Regions:
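Helical element adjacent to the flavin cofactor pocket in flavoenzyme catalytic cores
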Residues: 165, 172-176, 198-256, 260
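Active-site substrate-recognition segment that forms the wall
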Residues: 142-150, 237-239, 251-291, 295-394, ...
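Active-site-proximal substrate-binding core of FAD-dependent oxidoreductases
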Residues: 392, 420-459
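Glycine-rich Rossmann-fold phosphate-binding loop(s) that bind the pyrophosphate
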Residues: 62-66, 88
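Flavin (FAD/FMN) cofactor-binding and adjacent substrate-gating region
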Residues: 2-14, 26-33, 39-40, 109-115, ...
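Extreme N-terminal leader/targeting segments of oxidoreductases
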Residues: 1-58, 76-77, 81-82, 108, ...
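Glycine-rich FAD pyrophosphate-binding loop
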Residues: 75-98
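Glycine-rich active-site loop/strand segments that organize a redox cofactor
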Residues: 98-128
Length: 491
């Protein structure tokens, strides 16, 4: 979601919760199994792997939102293109099938882009993101994808004096970037939307919707295939080179090779330190009865977040559960979560920590069952800025680094890749999207281990300590530990 900490969003896991293949925890909680979003309908039927060497006009590596949206818009724009998507597991195995279901207008690094390219350039990026929420809903409707979409907006709440100060600053900044339809609420108005214990204020934007992540990715994959795009699953790409995507089963040769791997980028040869695979974890309750919802409210089904440094994110699902997430164990040494596919479930201590947040926000949920827990990785560039790139000399392109805000951002990134390829191939000139400030942004790699591990864990330890200190502090100033952590992170 849009981040007061990072100006332009690194907040709630829009494109990044999910790993794990475990079963139970002994408490009635299904732990792992991809995510809660697959619990009812199960894993989709597998598509055939790559049968051998092949050629294409465009080869897309990664069958999540970024890859599928890119295939969709390219094929719509140029129907004769031969497009192949290579997916290591199945479409939606990664963050696209595990995230918090936040379709919203946050984009990681917007404030940094304002510094680099000017305020008006960043305003254009923000407007494009605002419009993207409606674009995703439009395509879902056009393609008859039932993804439980409900456009209730996004509500960010503050529960301490320091959080309230950050909220007000965040609200002012968002308006300065053109979001003039955003509204600021006091404690009473906040409670009229959602009764969060201790909430002293909130900021609401209409540019957001709740959705079911797996339903969206499954529907999008089907729509892409219906257009004539070839999808090969169970086909891990081990190396990307100009005009070559190399797999254990053969090599796909194409003028354009697009890397759309987000949190799994570290699995590719030579890309271990490009984007850090940050972990995020979630829980989903049992369906809650009417008497509990009467105490909570939340009738507008806004996506819900807070202004803590180690923030939470949540939605009220279509079947009246609360799905809630947070950072949990933030990073595994050596980018291991990406390289090994995922650990065997979410650590019990993380599950209990998320339950504590749930009950702290909504005390009447104290006795409810947690039906599912899962965890996963999202992609974080060293400067925390999402980017879209096409190298015109090599034909290599990539998009990502959404820092957990990818459900909508992937769509804008895909349309931008489409325009960049059409421009490069001489089919069009520059467009509004190809001139956005995140295009062809360059960033250095992450530090080698153990500095990477120490930095990330030190940062989140500082955030959690700062949040704890702020709960008892009357001062509106953010705790010094959090400010120090922001400097360590390079935000």
């Amino acid at each position: 979601m849009t981040s007061a900490n990072n100006g332009g969003s690194d907040r709630h896991t829009g494109d990044g919760s999910g790993t794990g293949t475990g079963t139970g925890t002994g408490t009635g909680t299904s732990n792992g199994g991809i995510s809660f979003w697959y619990a009812k309908d199960g894993i989709p039927a597998p598509r055939e792997p790559l049968p051998g060497d092949a050629t294409a006009d465009v080869c897309i590596v990664g069958g999540g939102y970024t890859g599928l949206w890119t295939a969709y818009y390219l094929k719509k724009a140029v129907p004769f293109l031969n497009i192949t998507v290579l997916e290591g597991k199945f479409c939606g195995y990664g963050a696209s099938g595990r995230n918090g279901g936040w379709l919203y207008n946050g984009v990681a690094g917007r404030d940094r882009y304002a510094e680099l390219h000017g305020h008006e350039s960043a305003v254009r990026l923000q407007k494009a993101m605002n419009d993207t929420v409606a674009e995703v809903i439009r395509v879902a409707d056009e393609e008859k994808i039932d993804a439980d979409i409900h456009r209730g907006g996004v509500l960010e709440v503050a529960r301490t004096p320091a959080q309230l100060a950050r909220l007000k600053e965040f609200h002012t900044v968002e308006i300065a970037f053109g979001e003039t339809d955003r509204t600021l609420h006091g404690a009473r108005e906040t409670a009229e939307r959602v009764r969060v214990t201790g909430a002293v204020g909130s900021s609401w934007t209409p540019h957001g919707a709740r959705l079911h992540p797996a339903k969206l990715v499954k529907g999008l994959a089907a729509a892409v295939e219906a257009l004539g795009v070839t999808i090969h699953e169970s086909t891990p790409v081990t190396e990307i080179k100009p005009k070559h995507a190399i797999t254990p089963y053969g090599t796909v040769r194409a003028p354009y090779i697009l890397r759309c791997t987000e949190g799994f980028t570290a699995t590719l040869k030579g890309a271990r330190r490009a984007w850090l695979p940050m972990n995020s974890s979630m829980i989903a309750t049992e369906p809650l009865p009417a008497e509990i919802w009467d105490t909570i409210g939340w009738d507008g089904r806004e996506t819900l977040g807070d202004m803590a440094h180690a923030y939470m994110y949540a939605q009220r699902t279509a079947d009246d559960r609360i799905a809630l997430g947070g950072r949990g164990y933030p990073y595994r040494y050596g980018s291991r979560a990406a390289r090994l596919g995922h650990p065997s479930g979410t650590d019990p201590a993380t599950i209990e920590a998320l339950r504590d947040i749930l009950v702290d926000f909504f005390p009447t949920t104290a006795g409810v069952r947690i039906d599912h827990a899962w965890s996963g990785v999202l992609g974080v560039p060293r400067d925390w800025c999402a980017t879209v790139t096409l190298d015109r000399t090599t034909g290599l392109g990539w998009a990502g680094g959404y820092v957990g805000s990818g459900v909508a951002t992937t769509n804008l990134a895909a349309r931008t890749l489409r325009d960049l390829i059409q421009q490069d191939s001489g089919q069009s000139g520059p467009t509004d999207l190809t001139t956005l400030p995140w295009v062809n942004h360059k960033v250095r790699n992450w530090e080698p281990e153990p500095f990477r591990w120490l930095g990330v864990h030190g940062m989140y330890a500082a955030y959690r300590t700062a949040d704890h200190k702020e709960t008892t502090s009357p001062t509106p100033r953010s705790h010094p530990l959090a400010r120090a952590a922001n400097r360590i992170a390079g935000r």
